[in-house]
Curated annotation (Swiss-Prot):
Zn(2+) binds at C243, C248, H250, C256. One of several proteins that assist in the late maturation steps of the functional core of the 30S ribosomal subunit. Helps release RbfA from mature subunits. May play a role in the assembly of ribosomal proteins into the subunit. Circularly permuted GTPase that catalyzes slow GTP hydrolysis, GTPase activity is stimulated by the 30S ribosomal subunit. One of its GO terms (cellular component) is cytoplasm. Keywords: Cytoplasm, GTP-binding, Hydrolase, Metal-binding, Nucleotide-binding, Ribosome biogenesis, RNA-binding, rRNA-binding, Zinc. Monomer. Associates with 30S ribosomal subunit, binds 16S rRNA. The keyword Cell wall biogenesis/degradation does not apply. Pfam families: RsgA_GTPase, RsgA_N. This is Small ribosomal subunit biogenesis GTPase RsgA. GTP binds at N110, K111, V112, D113, G161, P162, S163, G164, A165, G166, K167, S168, T169. Belongs to the TRAFAC class YlqF/YawG GTPase family. RsgA subfamily. Its EC number is 3.6.1.-. Residues 61-218 form the CP-type G domain. Binds 1 zinc ion per subunit.
Length: 290
């Protein structure tokens, strides 16, 4: 029978088959092939005496490594607009990770009541201009949860963002229950105490939400090579193949159409600067491998 892994704890996988939840172990053949089932996997299982065994894993449409989550189709990138102030380099990092994993990203700005409408709109425009949808939310009060539930419909949705941004509180509001302990943000350091224990799919509005502890520790330089990075910036897309030199990295090469677009104001210069900084980190990391 077919089902979906919604939780994994200490080698046990909990597979939802229609309305039933079946505790399963994976066949030894997966370990021998260095394949590990992931939360979000669509699987075929056999059941005996109420216990299941995972026989096969269907092809994944996407996968994240930390935490191990498969078949994500949508990401809510949750950032507090204030307390702490939004870190655009960190936001760009999450957006690049979403693009690399072929996951649609929607930026959710939390704590919008702490800033003026003008400041809020300026931040929204800055993000809209690079091609991403922005939604205003107040995780504590539940503001914006209705439209988020509409977006979740039919998707497996991952919440990502820095510690203290309101992810756990938002999950509690979306699921109408205290799914996770919510850490208290330290006023001194402005970071949340991460209290999540494991990854899990939570059913919401004919879709699923995934809690993703540890996602913020991912380093781009660990995931991709220097040739991959430019394809993670949607605003580069129309220019990537029109540079003079094939394989142009949009850095020091002459007659680069991306650099020209930056000079003409068609590409945000701060995003481009983030691209160059990240590119240099990847190149340095590649040197250190050898």
């Amino acid at each position: 029978m077919k089902g979906k892994i919604i939780k994994g704890i200490a080698g046990f996988y909990y597979v939802k088959v229609e309305e039933n939840l079946i505790e399963c172990k994976a066949r030894g053949k997966f370990r021998h092939k260095d394949v590990k089932p992931m939360v979000g996997d669509n699987v075929v299982i056999q059941v005996e005496n109420g216990k299941g065994v995972i026989e096969s894993i269907e092809k994944r449409s996407s996968e994240l490594l930390r935490p191990a989550v498969a078949n994500i189709s949508l990401a809510f990138v949750v950032f507090a607009i204030k307390s702490p102030d939004i870190n655009f380099d960190l936001l760009n990092k999450f957006l690049v990770l979403c693009e690399y994993n072929h996951i649609e990203a929607i930026v959710c700005l939390n704590k919008v009541d702490l800033v003026s409408e003008e400041e809020r709109e300026n931040v929204k425009k800055r993000i809209n201009d690079i091609g991403y949808e922005v939604l205003y939310i107040n995780a504590k009060e539940g503001l914006g949860t209705d439209i988020l539930k509409e977006k979740i419909n039919g998707n497996i949705t991952v919440l990502c963002g820095p510690s203290g941004a309101g992810k756990s509180t938002l999950i509690n509001k979306l699921t109408n229950k205290e799914h996770m302990l919510t850490g208290i943000v330290s006023e001194k350091i402005g970071r949340g105490k991460h209290t999540t224990r494991h990854s899990e799919l939570i059913e919401v509005s004919n879709g699923y939400i995934v809690d993703t502890p540890g996602f913020s520790t991912l380093e781009i330089k660990e995931l991709m090579n220097k040739e991959d990075l430019k394809y993670c910036f949607p605003e580069f897309e129309e220019h990537n193949e029109s540079c003079k030199y094939r394989g142009c990295l949009h850095n020091k090469e002459p007659k680069c159409t991306v650099k020209q677009a930056v000079e003409e104001g068609k590409i945000n210069k701060y995003r481009y600067e983030f691209y160059i900084k990240t590119l240099e980190e990847i190149i340095e990391g590649e040197k250190n491998k050898w």
